[in-house]
Amino acid sequence: GDDVGPTKAIDEADLDDTNYYQLLGLEKSGIGVDADLVKRAYHKALLLYHPDKGSAKYETDAVFLAVQKGYDILKDKTKRRAYDSTNEFDDTIPKGNEGDQPNFDFYATYGPVFRANARFAEKMPVPELGDANSEEKDVENFYAYWVRFESWRDFDLETQSKEVHEEMDRYEKRHMKKENAKLAAKRKREEMERIILLVERARANDPRLKIFAEQLKAAKLEKRRSRENLRQA
């Protein structure tokens, strides 16, 4: 189909500002794209960038190699996840003190942040934050899911700052790999702490939880009153 694949060639000078999804014309599909779609986009990119067919106007070789590399990464689920983990992502979460502001909108503040982080969810489907009319069980399910959130975000690529070179001896190589793995594990821990903090801040500011707590308190009080009335009767 004509719905995927690059429509216009990218100049070599713009390669640094182009991610593999853009290069292969898959930016609309985004992460989670299936292998068949990647293959179709790659074939279209080959027609556009193949050095034999490329016009002299473009320095196609560097771009062509980038297309090859992009295809190699995006068609493979494990490699793609590692790439998606390093691809620009906004790690910021609400500060947690927004409730002090007069025009604070809990759903507009926290909803998009949970939705954005859901891209890394191992377990599907991911429950939505909902709104003021959400039922108590749905709100409980939402928080139960996020407290146990399993992220597939992978920091192996990001932490490979220490390159493992072929000319290194095996002890050096082993040491470098160990250091990189240690760094990746540290980033993963920080990532989980970030998600837990997001959940804690959301819970502290969720107006529905306050309402549910008040309703529970009122129900208990009512129960106690009716017991006392029975005793007095």
Feature locations, PLM:
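Residues that form ligand- and interface-recognition hot spots within folded domains
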Residues: 28-30, 87, 150
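Intrinsic disorder
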Residues: 14, 29-36, 58-61, 74-77, ...
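N-terminal J-domain/J-like co-chaperone modules of DnaJ/Hsp40 proteins
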Residues: 1-54
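Short amphipathic alpha-helical segments embedded in low-complexity Lys/Glu-rich regions
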Residues: 57-64, 82-92, 99-101, 161-164, ...
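Acidic, Ser/Thr-rich intrinsically disordered and amphipathic helical segments
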Residues: 19, 37, 41-44, 66-69, ...
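Ubiquitin/ubiquitin-like proteostasis machinery centered on ERAD and p97/Cdc48
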Residues: 1-15, 92-112
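Accessory regions outside conserved functional cores
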Residues: 1, 111-233
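J-domain helical core
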Residues: 32-49, 59-87
